[in-house]
Every structure is written in C-alpha cells, then in structure tokens.
C-alpha cells in the first residue's frame, strides 16, 4: 500500500493529495497496490471525495487529535461515528451502494 500525503501542508510546494490521486490511480492501473490518502480528512465528506477519486481508504490522524485531547477515547469514538454518518449520507444521496462502487463521476471538479 501507499499513503498519498503532503504532510498537512507543511511543505509549501507540495501538491494536495486529492489533486494527484486520479493520476496515481491511473498509473497504478489494475495493480493490487492499495492507496490511502492523508491530509485534510476531517469529515466524512472529505473521505467521500477521496474514495470517489480512487482511494481505498483515508487516514484521519489530525482530524481525531482535538477530540482525543478534549474528550479522550469517547471523543475519538464520537468523531469517527460522525465521519461514518457523513460518509453514509453522501453515499445515499449519490446512489453509491458500497465503497466498492465509487467513481469520480459523482464529483464535479
């Protein structure tokens, strides 16, 4: 697997992961290499965009840091539940029945 990241913008010249994700997906073609996206995955809507552009999963390290510091384990659990609800909501609105049926035609960019 690979993780596509720009270290949360700390590299001023780096391209945002969602901008290059379709290209990476095309280059990898039908390979078995999984793609995970990092940086800016703070909501289920962000995860939806990444999945639609070809990611197999997302990393939410920074997105759960604040809830962890404020509420501990419960804060993280609540944040993850909210993100899952947002993702499911977007999938329902766009007719994506499961995570294997995403494609970039659901986005306009």
What are these regions (language model features)?
Residues 5-11, 23, 31:
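Active-site entrance/lid segments in N-terminal catalytic domains of soluble metabolic enzymes
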Residues 8-14, 43, 66:
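Short, small-residue-enriched loops and turns at beta-alpha junctions
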């Amino acid at each position: 697997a690979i993780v596509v990241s720009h270290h949360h913008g700390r590299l001023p010249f780096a391209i945002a992961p969602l901008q290059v994700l379709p290209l990476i997906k095309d280059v990898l073609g039908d390979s078995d290499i999984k793609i995970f996206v990092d940086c800016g995955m703070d909501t289920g809507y962000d995860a939806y965009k990444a999945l639609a552009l070809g990611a197999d999963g997302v990393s939410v390290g920074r997105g759960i840091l604040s809830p962890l510091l404020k509420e501990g384990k419960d804060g993280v659990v609540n944040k993850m539940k909210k993100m899952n609800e947002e993702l499911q909501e977007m999938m329902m609105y766009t007719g994506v029945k499961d995570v294997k049926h995403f494609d970039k035609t659901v986005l306009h960019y």
